Amino acid sequence: MNTAFILLAQYNGIVIIPLERVCRDYFSHLTPEKLKLKIASGDIDLPLVAIEKSQKAARGVHLNDLATYLDAQHQKAKMEHEKLMGRGSGQSP
């Protein structure tokens, strides 16, 4: 399964997804402003794209960056699950 293709379909071909939509779809526990702060502080490893240099410019997330982030979160969850099941630390079950 290719996450980028799924996102492309989900967002109808939009390459730069508005921050508000990313927040609503994947970070619903945060406000867009809180998401922006977490990204700026490095708590969430997701590059923000500004359409122009103005501080008031719309910000969004490139589809490929969102796909990479989601895939990384998936890998972390799988590794945690493997550890929980006793399979990920080199131990025999």
Language-model segments: which ranges?
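Polyanion-binding surface elements
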Residues: 3-34, 69
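Generic hydrophobic, helix-prone segments enriched in Leu/Val/Ile
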Residues: 5-9, 45, 77, 81
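Short, structured coil/loop segments at alpha-helix boundaries
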Residues: 1-2, 75
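Residue-level marker of intrinsically disordered, low-complexity segments enriched
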Residues: 14-15, 59-61
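Major-groove DNA-recognition helix of helix-turn-helix-type DNA-binding domains
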Residues: 2, 25-60, 83-90
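A short, Lys/Arg-enriched interface patch at domain edges and termini
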Residues: 62-91
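Helix N-cap / beta->alpha transition motif
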Residues: 18, 47, 62-65
